[in-house]
Regions:
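An N-terminal structural lobe/cap that precedes and organizes the functional/catalytic core
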Residues: 36-40, 45-46, 52, 73, ...
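Helix-centric, low-specificity signal for extended rod-like, repetitive segments
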Residues: 12-14, 35-38, 49, 125, ...
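Interfacial alpha-helical end/capping and short helix-turn segments at domain and membrane boundaries
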Residues: 61-208
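Juxtamembrane membrane-water interface segments immediately C-terminal to a transmembrane helix
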Residues: 43-64, 68
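Membrane-embedded hydrophobic alpha-helical segments
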Residues: 1-47
């Protein structure tokens, strides 16, 4: 360092320059760290959006499956409601044989992400669960080869129609890809006819 002294370089300037270099390096390092964190968070948000979009499509498909089953079961109940003894227990079991909603149950911790649809989503699958238990109670009180009676048939038909209507609400809001459009329109028309027939048949009882 003798040559610095020989040219008259003040050590104070050198120290100041060194400190400024360290400060600039620190600022650049801090900025780089912020950029890395920002990029990581951005990538994470993109991943979450992709995963949620996939979940919406999966849940939407499951809702469609159950909605078709409920409107079909409702139609079977209506066809049997004129019988004096109502629907047979065998037909009731066959019509209301719903599978376990695997996608919904395995993603219960993500239900809150569906925002304004959360209540309807929980109500849809909750009503199906309640209906299963109702069918089990009816089975416990009816002979295996017997019928469930007109009142029980009407009650089950009303619950099935309500579930179908909730399903219609959900598929139009949770996920509505174009490749489902034709099937969704057919379902809406089928539900509209079922709702109109129900209201004409039971004008004072509404949809439940």
């Amino acid at each position: 360092m003798g040559w610095l002294n020989s040219v008259g370089c003040p050590w104070g300037y050198v120290d100041c320059l060194d400190k400024w270099q360290a400060l600039i390096a620190g600022i650049l390092g801090f900025a780089a760290a912020i950029i890395v964190v920002w990029m990581t968070l951005r990538a994470e948000r993109r991943k979450e959006r992709r995963e949620f979009q996939a979940l919406k499509i999966a849940i939407g498909s499951e809702i469609r499956q159950f909605a078709l089953m409920t409107i079909g079961a409702h139609e079977r109940c209506i066809a049997a409601i004129d019988h004096q003894s109502g629907m047979s227990l065998h037909d009731l079991e066959d019509a209301c044989r719903f599978p376990v909603p695997i996608i919904y149950e395995s993603n219960a911790n993500s239900v809150g992400k569906f925002g304004n649809c959360v209540h309807a989503l929980v109500l849809f699958f909750g009503n199906i669960s309640v209906l299963r238990r109702t069918v089990d109670r009816i089975k416990a009180n009816v002979h295996p080869n017997g019928s469930i009676g007109q009142d029980n048939t009407k009650m089950v038909a009303g619950v099935l129609l309500t579930i179908s209507e909730i399903g219609e609400f959900l598929v139009s809001r949770i996920d509505n890809p174009k490749y489902f459009a034709e099937a969704d329109n057919r379902y809406r028309e089928r539900l509209r006819e079922a709702r109109n027939a129900w209201n004409l048949r039971f004008p004072r009882s509404g949809n439940a």
